[in-house]
Amino acid sequence: MYINTGYLNHSHLDFKDKSRPLVVGSCGIYRLSGDPRMPTYRPKGRLDYQIIYIASGLGHFHFDKPENETIVPAGNMVLFRPKELQKYEYYGEDKTEVYWIHFTGSDVKNILRSYGLQDNQRVFPVGSSLEYEQIFKQIIQELQRCQEHYEEMLALLLRHLLIVFQRELTRVHILKNEYLDREMHSAVTYFNENYNQDISIEITPRQGA
């Protein structure tokens, strides 16, 4: 198993910080191979927010109740908010690789909304991108090296990550709308050209396919 992590002030404790709009607390990578299972269970959640990006494999998440299970595949991002139940597992057989980041701040809720991460959603289809992984690795390095103005750099890098997430979410939404528009246009054209025939609902999709 490969692990690479960085923690603000070398502290593993979760915290809430309202002194600044956005504060990164920790960030890391887990890459499972032969390890059978890596579980996390926080019944009362944490004080901060957490983003988990699944780069490969699968994540087994239990939202709201421990008995609920949602399998989240690669190419998705999971968002946990403060004090939400956090129960999830990764399995070596899935060859799972995840990137995670914990953050807090006085304006996090509005920042997330501004980048299209709605309050009632936990899983976001952000796709797979090396750019995501590069940003996570930069954040880890900043936490490990603690160079001048690194806390400000951490906040900027997190915003960068949120922006590229939003761009992909917006692109997916546009592609879906374009697909629906094309399908609707094809259906209207077919009906116009065959208005004098008996048209069965069963054959219509095949004619437009």
What are these regions (language model features)?
Residues 2, 10-12, 19, 26-118, ...:
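N-terminal regulatory/effector-sensing and dimerization cores
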Residues 22-24, 72, 133, 175-177:
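Short, flexible segments with low predicted structural confidence
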